[in-house]
Amino acid sequence: MPVDVGISQRVRPLRWLVVAAVLVFGAVGFPAAGPAGADEGPVTSVSGGMIRGARVDGVLQYLGVPFAASTGGVNRFAPPRPAPSWTGVRAATAHGPQCPQSSPLPWTPAVQPASEDCLAIDVYVPEHPAGTELPIMVWFYGGAFVLGSNAQYDSPARLVRDGQVIVAIPNYRLGPFGFLALPELAAAEGGMTGTYGTLDQQAALRWIRDNAAAFGGNPDNLTLFGESAGGMSVCTQLAAPTARGLYAKAIIESGSCARSPLAPASKEQAYQRSADYAAGLGCAEAATRLACLRALPADRMLDSPTTTLHTMAVTWAPVRDDVVVTTSPENALADGAARDIPLVVGSNADEGATFLALLDFARATVPDSADYVSWAREIFTGNADRVLQRYPVVAFPTPAEAKQHVITDGFFACPALFTTRAARRGGARVWQYEFNDAPLGHNPILPGAFHGAEVPYVFSGLLGVPIPLPPAADRLSQRIQQSWAQFAHTGNPETPAFAPWPSASDTTRTLELGSDDITVADSFALRHQCDLWSDIGHIG
C-alpha cells in the first residue's frame, strides 16, 4: 500500500534514516578524504613498512593500512594473502576503498570508491605515555553481510580519548566475494569455503596482534565488538576454532548468536544458494563455473538480487564449512566456547522500526493486513499460524506495528536472550542489556530505539559527521562509552552509572538503558514473548 508521509515528518529523521541505512546496509559512503585540521602526523613501523598517520582531536589516526593483499584475480574466493611491503613512509591519512557491494536504496547518494584491493584497517589511538599497553577494541561493521565499510565508523574519538582504548576497524569481503561456497572451492582450500569474509576478519586480528606494540596496544587484551552483521561476525569468531586466542572479550550489539537468518549456513544450503547465484550470472556448468565467476568484472558479480537486502531473509553469510566454522554459534557457546571470554550481549527495544523504514517506507509502501499476513507466511512458513496468533493484527494500532513487533521480538530481542542463555550454559560470564532510548522521539518513520540507534551513542558520529544528541541522550552516550571502555580494560562493564548489572548465573535480569532511567528489569522474556520464539529453531 502506498505511504503518504508529510514533508515535515520526513525532514527531521532524514539524517537518522541515512544513519539507519549505514547501520543495516552499510549503504552510504563518501569519497575518502584526509582529516580536517590534522597536523604533521606521527610515524610508526608496522608489518610492511613505515606509516604516517594524523593527530586529530587528541587521537592518532592511521587510516587505510593494508593488512592483506588484493582479493582480485586469482585471489577472488581465496583466503586472504599477506599484504606486499612498501618502501619509504606510507601516508595513512585517508580511508582505503570499500569492498565491492551494491546499494540497497534508489535514493542512496554516491558510494565511496570500491575495489577488490580493499583489505585495509583503520586504527585510532589515544595520546598515551610511552610504555603503555592499551586495550584494543576491534569493530566489525554491520550491513547484512552484503554492505558496509570501516570508513563509515570514523568518529570514535571520545571513546578512544576518554576511555584510553585503541579502536581498530578492518574491512572484510561481502556478498559473494566473502561467502560464496562451492565444492570445488572446498577441494582447493583444504575444506575451507564460504568463509572468506570471516578469514579476512581473522587476518586483521592477527595483524593487530602482531603490530599492537607499534600503537601502544596490548596484544593479549583485545575485545571484539560489532553491531547487526558485525555482531554476528563476533558470534562467528566465537564459533571458529581458527580464531581461538586472537581475542579476550566480546560485545555483541543487535546481532545475536542464536536463531538468526545471519547465522552460518550449512554447506549444503550454501552450495545450493551459490550454485543458483552462479547460474544466474551465466556460470552454471560445475566444471567451469569457478573460472567463469573469477573472470567476471566485479560489477557483474553484483548484478544479482542476492547482493542486496529486500526482505528479512538473506543469501550471503558465513558458512559452517567444518574447518573455519565447525558448528553454530549458539551450540558453540553452549559447549563452552566463551567459558573464558567475558561477553556483553544486547538488543534495542524497537529493532523492527528500522526494517520497516528501509524495506517498506523508503520504497513508498506500508504493509496492510493482507501484506502482513502474506509476509509472515513467507518468512515463518510452518510456524506462521503460531506467530499470527500471538501477534494478531487487531492487537496493534496498524499492521506495520504488528510487523515491527514481530521483527523486534523474533529476530533480535529473544535471540539475544537465547544467546545469553547458551553462553551461561557453557560457563561464560555474560551481561545483557536492552537499549531503550528514542533519539527521534515518537517520529513516525523511525520511532523508539530502532535497529542501529545505539551505534552513534558508541561512536558519537558516523561518516565523519557528528550525530547530535539531546543533553540527556549524550549523557547516556558517555555512560555507554565508559562502560564499553571499562569492559575492554577489565572484563567487567559495570560502572557506577551501570550498577547493579547482574551477570553470572542470573538468566532473567537485563539492564535497561535509557536517557531518563537506567534500571534492572526481569520482564524481558515476557515483554518480548520469548516462550513463543524459544522453539522456533531458525528464523528467516
Residue spans for each PLM region:
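Short, solvent-exposed turn/loop segments enriched in Gly/Ser/Thr/Pro and often Arg
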Residues: R173-G175, F225-A229, E434-P439, A499-S505
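Non-catalytic accessory segments of hydrolases
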Residues: A36-T195, M312, A370, T381, ...
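Substrate-gating cap/lid region and adjacent catalytic-acid/histidine neighborhood
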Residues: A258-P261, A298-A472
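Secretory targeting and sorting signals
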Residues: P2-A38
